[in-house]
Amino acid sequence: MITIKKGLDLPIAGVPTQVINDGNSITKVALLGEEYVGMRPTMHARVEDVVKKGQILFADKKNPGVIFTSPVSGKVVEINRGAKRVLQSVVIAVEGEEQVTFNSYAANQLASLDRDAIKQQLIDSGAWTALRTRPFSKVPAIDSETKAIFVTAMDTNPLAADAEVIINQQEDAFVAGLDLLSVLTGEKVYVCKKGGSLPRSSQGNVEEHVFDGPHPAGLAGTHMHYLYPVDLNNVAWSIGYQDVIAFGQLFLTGEIYSDRIVSLAGPAVNNPRLVRTITGASLLELTDSEVMPGEVRIISGSVLNGTQASGPHAYLGPYHQQVCVLREGREKEFLGWAVPGKNKFSVTRSFLSHVFSGQLFNMTTTTNGSDRAMVPIGSYERVMPLDMEPTMLLRDLCAGDVDSAARLGALELDEDDLGLCTYVCPGKYEYGPMLREILDTIEKEG
């Protein structure tokens, strides 16, 4: 067991009940182009086209051979683009049940399949895009290989679903997915979980590792740091546990599995719980009648690093397993820093609330202050469990110092890994976008 001592479990109200329920009926789904780092699309579908489940919608011209397929059968009703014609979303109205089918296999055949056959079916179905590289967090090139695949079979994000509850309902598919990954790499598959019992693969190169402690103990970046540190020469891949289930279902049934179980939670949700929905589901439909009255913000993903679900982005992200709802914090409080703060949370224990252990807080979107200078008071060190100097690294991200940031460990990180640093920052800096700029520069300059 690897125990993480530094970090933070955010005490936010609206914790979900760990029981799976059916979510609202969904009539629109979307593929969100900006969720795929560095992707530039070549469109294969137009508005008004009728598409089957599993039919190609667009391909990545910067990553030849990688295609993105429809998670449902229906009609393309919107193709939304932003500045510089960046693809924001391809929206599909759900109609019918036509689908593209693929080869199916018995469970005991999977571990003996040819690696190229597995890879080709993953690519043709669009399931290949569930894999992400580290460094850079991109979809792997179809001719690339790795010595390490990390399965994130746990989730320590605030308000997250318990991975064990979901995996144990799909034991056969999860084991099938692990068997496929064991062939895909030929080297190590690291299944990273918290304490508890999960279905296990019988393949010798599939290892289980237990992580314990506060967030970010459940992030792939944390797991890689302790088990297989990455750099430009040592590239690892990561995949979420629900995508492993989808891999298994694809090969066991020959059909694309687009179900997604998400945590619908937060202080502004009427009945926080786990709900079954579809990959790319409309979050306006999913949260209909689920949210308390008033102005709220719907977030696809974690409250620490999710995406605001509005306009062309109002859909469930492909890598997200949470939908969080917070009240918009537009109210200003006169001399708020001077009050005892019984109902306010502070990482630095500045308020009276720290004497009431176990208290949950109705947090809002307010930043509790305006932008200011980056002040090194030890906050970053409290929440960063990785063996690096966070204050120095974050300073280099602010300054755009590529060489120094790379030396201090930027290549090991993803935006998720800096979510807590952004949350505790006294200067209100957003470190995720800064990290992405540095990583883009490193990749561009080789």
Curated annotation (Swiss-Prot):
EC primary class: translocase
Any Pfam family hit: NQRA_2nd
InterPro entries: NqrA (IPR008703), NQRA_2nd (IPR056148), NqrA_C_domain (IPR022615), NQRA_N (IPR056147)
Catalysed reaction, written as an equation: a ubiquinone + n Na(+)(in) + NADH + H(+) = a ubiquinol + n Na(+)(out) + NAD(+)
Keywords noted in UniProt: Ion transport, NAD, Sodium, Sodium transport, Translocase, Transport, Ubiquinone
Highest rank taxon of the organism: Bacteria
GO molecular function: oxidoreductase activity, acting on NAD(P)H, quinone or similar compound as acceptor
Disulfide topology: none
Family: Belongs to the NqrA family.
Oligomer status and interactors: Composed of six subunits; NqrA, NqrB, NqrC, NqrD, NqrE and NqrF.
Alphabetized HAMAP family for the sequence: NqrA
PANTHER family, per the entry: NA(+)-TRANSLOCATING NADH-QUINONE REDUCTASE SUBUNIT A (PTHR37839:SF1)
Entry function: NQR complex catalyzes the reduction of ubiquinone-1 to ubiquinol by two successive reactions, coupled with the transport of Na(+) ions from the cytoplasm to the periplasm. NqrA to NqrE are probably involved in the second step, the conversion of ubisemiquinone to ubiquinol.
Protein name as catalogued: Na(+)-translocating NADH-quinone reductase subunit A
Organism expressing this protein natively: Aliivibrio salmonicida (strain LFI1238)
